[in-house]
Amino acid sequence: QTAAQRGVKLAVFPEFCLTGYTCGDLFLQRTLQQGALDALEWLLAQTRTLDTVALVGLPLLVHGKLYNCAAVLCRGQLLGIVPKTYLPNYGEFYEKRQFTPGSTEVQTVTVCGQQVPFGTSLLFRCRQMPSFVLGVELCEDLWSALPPSTFHALAGATVIANLSASDETVGKAE
């Protein structure tokens, strides 16, 4: 609400901001997954009258597979869900243990009672600002040889949002 009051049109929150990044195997627990959906539903209700596009990170179970996702929402509506493509599995990162990589194939899924597109190749266009075309990727996606953002830009994206988070380990900054 504060962002909308200040005229912010796009608010990008961190990867897994609805649960925290360091949940590890707790991501596999139905209670945590439902808690993330409950938080998303609450956000949808709180943003019904707001003219800000918000991107929030959450784990999402789709057809029996768990994904690390960005939910794109505005005015109480889910505009789409973008799953992470490249899952890190080195050092302190073990995402392949819990998550499935996203696909460019777009499918329709039901989230919080809304039918929404789900896929890594989604672009979000603003009717009031035709030159504003949003592409979304998550953290490690950016560091791949061919990041989703490259394909988003080639498809017409003028803004790329990257939801990122990381855990903290002793000596990481060294």
Residue ranges and their predicted role:
Residues Q1-E174:
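Enzyme catalytic cores with a strong preference for nitrogen-chemistry domains
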